[in-house]
């Protein structure tokens, strides 16, 4: 489990800094297609080796490394590409829909995988993954995107490009504070993200259906939240939307901590799922609006690194504490601090857009 976690996070973090430079330097559409294609080829090789009888856990780890690296390129590339093809007034709607689709996939994937594995081999699931990837690449191929090639950036080394990104972040105080807020909140919500299965087992029972229900209610809520933010569009001031979602998240974390019965816990978990895209989507749109297009790749790569590091860092803090205190206590106190973050955003003038 530890090795798979490292394989899933480390390459994504390691490649993101360089990926940001590449995304700002080359055609973003091609970067997305290339990363998806590399992942598909790695999965195809894995499926072929499994079919020949060569089945090794290390093969899975290697492919997981490649998939993680591909995600480290693809995710910031998608966020950087969206402003190129979407009018500014529709950014919130499109990013909300994108968030909803991602959450819906998370919601449906476990059930779909279980259904496929009940009637077919694991190799079949690998081939299905390759086919869906090729389908996605084909859709991306036909989308018309204005060429984005930064000739000036091509003349500089990757390290110079990374240095430029950090210099840009240092000079833009609002963006720096926004990313710092994201890191702090992600650390604080890590108990709700990772420790709730432990809470369910300790407080409500270790039956598998309870753990499944816990995961599915959050994913369903996140899908609904993406639809909500896409339809609503948020407040005219993006930071007010983020602050409201942050405050609700904190209150709902406290609700999780005091929920007396499992049904109430599931309701709070579903509502937390709704607040997540309402917090993340305005932040993404703000970066798309406020950051120079030539820096989109590098800034979104820094956000990717922040997200990838913050949750594990939170678990380094809250994991050992869960052996000393109940998860409920951790959720309540972390939720209070999340509320303080929301209050600071509203009351402080440091986040004025």
Language-model region placement:
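Substrate-agnostic recognition of the 12-TM MFS/MFS-like secondary transporter fold
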Residues: 2-23, 27-42, 59-117, 128, ...
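C-terminal transmembrane bundle of multi-pass solute transporters/carriers
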Residues: 4, 25, 31, 45, ...
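Helix-interface capping motifs at the ends of transmembrane segments in multi-pass membrane proteins
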Residues: 48-55, 264
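Membrane-water interface of transmembrane alpha-helices in multipass transporters/channels
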Residues: 54, 58, 125-130, 208-210
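Transmembrane alpha-helical segments that form the membrane-embedded catalytic/substrate-channel core
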Residues: 69, 136-137, 342
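Generic alpha-helical segment signature
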Residues: 75, 155-159, 244
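Helix-loop junctions on the cytosolic side of multi-pass membrane transporters
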Residues: 80, 84, 126-156, 346-353
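Juxtamembrane intracellular "pre-TM" segments in multi-pass secondary transporters
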Residues: 145-180
């Amino acid at each position: 489990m530890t090795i798979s976690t490292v394989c899933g996070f480390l390459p994504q973090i390691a490649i993101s800094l360089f990926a940001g430079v590449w995304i700002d330097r080359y055609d973003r559409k091609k970067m997305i297609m290339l990363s998806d294609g590399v992942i598909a080829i790695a999965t195809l090789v894995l499926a072929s080796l499994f079919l020949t009888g060569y089945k090794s856990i290390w093969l899975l780890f290697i492919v997981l490394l490649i998939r993680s690296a591909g995600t480290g390129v693809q995710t910031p590339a998608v966020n950087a590409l969206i402003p190129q093809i979407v009018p500014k007034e529709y950014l919130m709607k499109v990013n909300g829909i994108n968030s909803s689709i991602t959450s819906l996939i998370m919601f449906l994937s476990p059930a779909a995988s279980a259904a496929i594995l009940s009637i077919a081999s694991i190799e079949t699931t690998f081939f299905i993954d390759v086919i869906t990837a090729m389908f996605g690449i084909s859709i991306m191929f036909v989308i018309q995107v204005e060429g984005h090639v930064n000739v000036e950036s091509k003349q500089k080394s990757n390290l110079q490009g990374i240095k430029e990104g950090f210099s840009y972040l240092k000079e833009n105080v609002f963006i720096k504070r926004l990313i710092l807020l994201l890191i702090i909140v992600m650390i604080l919500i890590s108990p709700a993200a990772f420790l709730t299965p432990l809470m369910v087992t300790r407080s409500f029972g270790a039956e598998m259906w309870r753990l499944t229900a816990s995961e599915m209610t959050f994913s369903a809520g996140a899908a609904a939240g993406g639809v909500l933010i896409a339809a609503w569009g948020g407040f005219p001031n993006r930071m007010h939307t983020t602050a409201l979602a942050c405050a609700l998240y904190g209150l709902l974390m406290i609700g999780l901590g005091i929920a007396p019965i499992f049904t109430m816990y599931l309701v709070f978990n579903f509502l937390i799922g709704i607040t997540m895209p309402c917090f993340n989507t305005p932040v993404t749109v703000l970066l798309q609006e406020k950051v120079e297009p030539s820096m989109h790749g590098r800034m979104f790569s820094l956000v990717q690194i922040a997200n990838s590091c913050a949750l594990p860092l939170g678990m380094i803090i809250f994991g050992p504490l869960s052996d000393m205190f109940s998860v409920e206590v951790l959720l309540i106190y972390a939720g209070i601090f999340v509320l303080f973050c929301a209050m600071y955003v509203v009351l402080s003038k440091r986040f004025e857009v």
